[in-house]
Curated annotation (Swiss-Prot):
InterPro entries: Neur_chan_lig-bd (IPR006202), Neur_chan_lig-bd_sf (IPR036734), Neur_channel (IPR006201), Neuro-gated_channel_TM_sf (IPR036719), Neuro_actylchol_rec (IPR038050), Neurotrans-gated_channel_TM (IPR006029), Neurotransmitter_ion_chnl_CS (IPR018000), Nicotinic_acetylcholine_rcpt (IPR002394)
Gene Ontology CC annotations of this record: postsynaptic membrane
Source species: Tetronarce californica (Pacific electric ray)
Topological domain ranges for the Cytoplasmic compartment: 321-432
SUPFAM superfamilies to which the protein is assigned, alphabetical: Neurotransmitter-gated ion-channel transmembrane pore, Nicotinic receptor ligand binding domain-like
Keywords: Cell membrane, Disulfide bond, Glycoprotein, Ion channel, Ion transport, Ligand-gated ion channel, Membrane, Postsynaptic cell membrane, Receptor, Signal, Synapse, Transmembrane, Transmembrane helix, Transport
Assembly description: Pentamer of two alpha chains, and one each of the beta, delta, and gamma chains.
Top-level taxon of the source organism: Eukaryota
Gene3D superfamilies: Neurotransmitter-gated ion-channel ligand-binding domain, Neurotransmitter-gated ion-channel transmembrane domain
Name this protein carries in UniProt: Acetylcholine receptor subunit alpha
UniProt lineage: Eukaryota, Metazoa, Chordata, Craniata, Vertebrata
Signal sequence segment: 1-24
Cysteine disulfide links: 152-166, 216-217
Length: 461
C-alpha cells in the first residue's frame, strides 16, 4: 500500500515536470516566432533612420598561432565580443513565461559587418556564424571565434633579439560613423585566457579608436578600432641553433694557428671549417626574414663569421709559404730577424731560437788560412801556423785543398739549414701571434654585435 502511494507521487511529479518543459518550450517557440515574424535583417535596428547603432567591441586574444617573418603574417586565434541594442527584438518576460534571455542563430538577425582591415591571407570577415545571446531589453551579445591572419611589418634590425609592434585594425565595412558607431569595450584587449607562446612574450597591448576621413567623402567619418600588440621574441632557439654554432666555428678557425705547419693539415682544417660553415648557412638561411630593409643582427654575425674564416685561410697560406722558404729563394731581411726572432719571443714569453756559437777560433794552415778545427773537428786555441817545407809537396797541398773544400761545403750546408730554421721559427711566431689575435677578435666581434641590443633589452626590463 505504501509502495503504491510512493509510485503515484512520483508519477505526478514527472507529469508536472513534463508539463513545465512543454510549456517552457511553447513559450520560447512563440517568443522566437513573434520576434522574427516581420523582422528584416537587412535594415539597421534603430527607431529612426537618423539614429546610429552603437556597437561595443571587445577583442579576446586566445592564442598566438604563428609569426611568419618571411611573409610578414601574424596568425592569431581570437574571439570578437560584440554588443549592441536591437530595438525590434524586445519583449515583456511576463507574456512569455518569464523568459528573459534566448539564443538565436546569428543568420536570422541584423549583424554588423565588422572586418579585419589589415587582413593578409584569410577571411576578412567572421566566417563561424555562432548563435548570439539576446535578452528582453533587446541587448545582443555575440562572441564568435575567428582565426585572423593579419599583416605585420616585421622589423628585423635586431633579430633574434627583436620586439615587434603588430596591429589588428577592425572596422565596419559598409557603414560610416553616422550610421554605425563602434567603441572599444576597454583600452586593452582581454588576455585572461591567453595561451603562452614558446617563441613570443606579450610585453604590452592596447586599443585605440580612430576617426578616419577619406578623400572620397571628407565630411563623413569612418570608425575603426586598432589594437597594438608589442611582442618580444624569446631568442633561446636561435642562440642554441645559430649563434653558438657560429661562435664554435670561429673558435675552431682560431685553432688552425695552433696546429703545427709540419703536420700538413693546416689548410685541410681551414677548408673543412669553411665548407662546414657554408653548409650550415644554407640550412639556416630560411630562418632569417628575407627583407632588404635592414640587415639583422644574426645576419651581421654570420657575415662576420664567414669573413673571419676566409681571412684565416688567406693568412694560413702566407704562414705556410713563410714556413717553407729557403735561403736560395728568399733572404731574410734584418728587420724580420730583429722583430720575429729577437723581440717578439721575449715579449710573448716563449722559447727563443737557439743559434750556433760564433766563437770559433780560426787556425791557419800554412799561408792558405785553413781552420784546423774544420779539419779535425776539434777546437784549437791559439793560432797555429805551419811553416814547413811540406807546403811544396804537391800531394800534401792537394789533400789540404780537398779538406778545405769539404769544410766549406759543410759550412754552406749548415748556414743554409740555419736560414731555413729561421724561416720556420718566424712562421711559428706568426702562428702564435695570430692565435691570440684571432681568439681576441672572435670574442670582441661577438660582444660588439650583440652587446648593444642586450643592454637595451635589460634597461627596458
Amino acid at each position: 500500500m505504501i509502495l503504491c502511494s510512493y509510485w503515484h507521487v512520483g508519477l505526478v511529479l514527472l507529469l508536472f515536470s513534463c508539463c513545465g518543459l512543454v510549456l517552457g518550450s511553447e513559450h520560447e517557440t512563440r517568443l522566437v516566432a513573434n520576434l522574427l515574424e516581420n523582422y528584416n535583417k537587412v535594415i539597421r535596428p534603430v527607431e529612426h533612420h537618423t539614429h546610429f547603432v552603437d556597437i561595443t567591441v571587445g577583442l579576446q586574444l586566445i592564442q598566438l598561432i604563428s609569426v611568419d617573418e618571411v611573409n610578414q603574417i601574424v596568425e592569431t586565434n581570437v574571439r570578437l565580443r560584440q554588443q549592441w541594442i536591437d530595438v525590434r527584438l524586445r519583449w515583456n518576460p511576463a507574456d512569455y513565461g518569464g523568459i528573459k534571455k534566448i539564443r538565436l542563430p546569428s543568420d536570422d538577425v541584423w549583424l554588423p559587418d565588422l572586418v579585419l582591415y589589415n587582413n593578409a591571407d584569410g577571411d576578412f570577415a567572421i566566417v563561424h556564424m555562432t548563435k548570439l545571446l539576446l535578452d528582453y531589453t533587446g541587448k545582443i551579445m555575440w562572441t564568435p571565434p575567428a582565426i585572423f591572419k593579419s599583416y605585420c611589418e616585421i622589423i628585423v634590425t635586431h633579430f633574434p633579439f627583436d620586439q615587434q609592434n603588430c596591429t589588428m585594425k577592425l572596422g565596419i565595412w559598409t557603414y560610416d560613423g553616422t550610421k554605425v558607431s563602434i567603441s572599444p569595450e576597454s583600452d586593452r584587449p582581454d588576455l585572461s585566457t591567453f595561451m603562452e607562446s614558446g617563441e613570443w612574450v606579450m610585453k604590452d597591448y592596447r586599443g585605440w579608436k580612430h576617426w578616419v576621413y577619406y578623400t572620397c567623402c571628407p565630411d563623413t567619418p569612418y570608425l575603426d578600432i586598432t589594437y597594438h600588440f608589442i611582442m618580444q621574441r624569446i631568442p633561446l632557439y636561435f642562440v642554441v641553433n645559430v649563434i653558438i654554432p657560429c661562435l664554435l666555428f670561429s673558435f675552431l678557425t682560431g685553432l688552425v694557428f695552433y696546429l703545427p705547419t709540419d703536420s700538413g693539415e693546416k689548410m685541410t682544417l681551414s677548408i673543412s671549417v669553411l665548407l662546414s660553415l657554408t653548409v650550415f648557412l644554407l640550412v639556416i638561411v630560411e630562418l632569417i626574414p628575407s627583407t632588404s630593409s635592414a640587415v639583422p643582427l644574426i645576419g651581421k654575425y654570420m657575415l662576420f663569421t664567414m669573413i673571419f674564416v676566409i681571412s684565416s685561410i688567406i693568412i694560413t697560406v702566407v704562414v705556410i709559404n713563410t714556413h717553407h722558404r729557403s735561403p736560395s729563394t728568399h733572404t731574410m731581411p734584418q728587420w724580420v730577424r730583429k722583430i720575429f726572432i729577437d723581440t717578439i719571443p721575449n715579449v710573448m714569453f716563449f722559447s727563443t731560437m737557439k743559434r750556433a756559437s760564433k766563437e770559433k777560433q780560426e787556425n791557419k794552415i800554412f799561408a792558405d788560412d785553413i781552420d784546423i778545427s774544420d779539419i779535425s773537428g776539434k777546437q784549437v786555441t791559439g793560432e797555429v801556423i805551419f811553416q814547413t817545407p811540406l807546403i811544396k809537396n804537391p800531394d800534401v797541398k792537394s789533400a789540404i785543398e780537398g779538406v778545405k773544400y769539404i769544410a766549406e761545403h759543410m759550412k754552406s750546408d749548415e748556414e743554409s739549414s740555419n736560414a731555413a730554421e729561421e724561416w720556420k721559427y718566424v712562421a711559428m711566431v706568426i702562428d702564435h701571434i695570430l692565435l691570440c689575435v684571432f681568439m681576441l677578435i672572435c670574442i670582441i666581434g661577438t660582444v660588439s654585435v650583440f652587446a648593444g641590443r642586450l643592454i637595451e633589452l635589460s634597461q627596458e626590463g
